[in-house]
Regions:
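Positively charged, small/polar-rich N-terminal and surface patches that mediate targeting and assembly
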Residues: 1-127
Length: 127
């Protein structure tokens, strides 16, 4: 276990459908705003515009570096179908050093060499 001062955390949001949740997840990971996004179905009960509502939704658990929160929030708002999407950040107090190192590397900006390597992998997978 690693006690960390690094600003890693979980960001929670919900989406109206699996399709929307997957699109959000792919965009966040592709843009290196998230290392990983876990998705699962949930049933929510809430008040919206003074009316009690309940709805099946998809919960996204986004693992990220919280210093990226402003850009991550902007991307979620850009892609989200809700007027007021849930966007809540929770810090990670401790975790596996190996996992947290991977998380940090996954959201770090890519070096030019890494971009070329990834592009080559993409080119090979399209053949």
């Amino acid at each position: 276990m690693c006690d960390l001062p690094a600003p890693y955390g979980l960001v929670l949001t919900t989406a109206a459908s699996r399709t929307e949740a997957e699109a959000l997840a792919r965009a966040l990971v592709a843009e290196r705003l998230a290392a990983c996004v876990s998705l699962f179905p949930v049933h929510s009960v809430y008040t919206w515009q003074n009316t009690l509502e309940q709805q099946d939704e998809w919960q996204l658990v986004i693992k990220t570096d919280l210093t990226l929160f402003p850009a991550l929030e902007t991307k979620i708002r850009e892609l989200h179908s809700y007027d007021v999407p849930e966007i809540i950040a929770l810090p990670i107090a401790a975790g596996s050093a190996d996992y947290l190192n991977w998380l940090g590397a996954s959201v770090s900006p890519l070096s030019p060499l890494s971009r070329v390597s990834l592009q080559n992998q993409d080119d090979k997978s399209e053949r």
